[in-house]
Amino acid sequence: MTETQFGGDEYDVSVSVSEAAVERALDVRPADVAPASSLTFARNVFVPLTTACRYTCTYCTYYDVPGEASLLTPEEIREQCRVGADAGCTEALFTFGDQPDDRYTAIHEQLGEWGYDSIHEYLRAACEIALEAGLLPHANPGDQTRAQMATVADVNASMGVMLETTADVQAHGGPRAKSPEQRLHTIDVAGDLGVPFTTGILVGIGEDWRDRAESLLAIRALHERHDHVQEVIVQPVRPNARWQGEPPGAETMRRVVAMARAVLPAEVGVQVPPNLTDVRGLVDCGVDDLGGVSPVTKDHINPDYAWPALDELSAIADHAGVPLRERLPVYERFLPADGGTADDGWVSQRIWRAIEDGDRYEAVRAE
């Protein structure tokens, strides 16, 4: 059987994708998959810990160059979490650009003044603030080593990183090019550490159809190894201040979403961002999740594209003829069954205790 290998010794990860599986994925069309029986979403507050990033991807407006990057103070984190909790959110979404490199001297000096040796130590403190405010942390800090993820895993309900693509694309180019192998390594490490994980692909950054199929199959292979992927995002790249490329059309998105649904196991959700896609035109292609939507903060990664209001999500579900259900940032299958303890699930004692003690979490789980 012909196979393509992704990864390698440098990042201690290896993923095999068979040619037969690629061909099957490429044959999938929307008519080949069934619509989901419901749509889910999480109510979050988006907390951009820092805009420093060692990468300079040409489609990304999130990062700021050295000297201009921001770093939220503990007080700012606490206030944003308070506002989110007051608005009924259950999730604190923490993002920052991948490990800020040595060019960001001001960021590292500020962290040192606050008593933190690394951005991951600070992320841990931020997650503690969120838990104290009554929110469940979901951190997306980009590429991570095993040690970095282990630093914060027990204070996160779930974590994530976008694979984006297994291809080497020009949009990732430059002296600090993003490596697909590093992303695969991060997803693999999450499984090793037992972290419920969200990942996904970007559509429209220079990848082709084969790349899309291989990317989804690589995610499936890692999930089959660890059983830890809770959802896969299919996200189009939209024009912004740094990227003026043509966005993928409606038929492209329909086919990619259908491919994702056909490739991924049934227990893995297929998510599309409702501020970046025409969800009504995709719900018959297997979409079952709309991701985190915030009633109080903007999408800091895609600031030009506002999240829809929650009643708009209800209208989308009504149009599709399916119920809309709120969920926690960790999927129910990763939690202990009724009467169980943290030892019976994937989340840490700290996270499970927070979920058990939170009336808001209990109400969401009961939906």
UniProtKB/Swiss-Prot annotation:
UniProt domain Radical SAM core: residue ranges: 39-275
MF GO annotations: 4 iron, 4 sulfur cluster binding; 7,8-didemethyl-8-hydroxy-5-deazariboflavin synthase activity; iron ion binding; transferase activity, transferring alkyl or aryl (other than methyl) groups
Reaction(s) catalysed (UniProt annotation): 5-amino-5-(4-hydroxybenzyl)-6-(D-ribitylimino)-5,6-dihydrouracil + S-adenosyl-L-methionine = 7,8-didemethyl-8-hydroxy-5-deazariboflavin + 5'-deoxyadenosine + L-methionine + NH4(+) + H(+)
Pathway: Cofactor biosynthesis; coenzyme F0 biosynthesis
Enzyme Commission code: 4.3.1.32
Function field: Catalyzes the radical-mediated synthesis of 7,8-didemethyl-8-hydroxy-5-deazariboflavin from 5-amino-5-(4-hydroxybenzyl)-6-(D-ribitylimino)-5,6-dihydrouracil.
Protein name per Swiss-Prot or TrEMBL: 7,8-didemethyl-8-hydroxy-5-deazariboflavin synthase
Gene: cofG
